[in-house]
Amino acid sequence: MKSFLVIGLGRFGASVAQELSALGQEVLALDIDAENVQYISDQVTQAIQGDAQDEAVLRSVGARNFD
């Protein structure tokens, strides 16, 4: 199993996150919009609200550790 970080949960990002999760992959989804995070939270391994343009946020989720 691989681990994926999906940044941005608009139509495309949410679809990617859902498909990866359905394929049995570990998915951390990140978006600045709380509604997008809430929508996807029960469909992925973890969903976090945060600004992906903030390096501290990316470090805190361990962005370098994903496939």
How does the language model describe each region?
Residues 1-67:
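Cytosolic regulatory regions of ion transport systems
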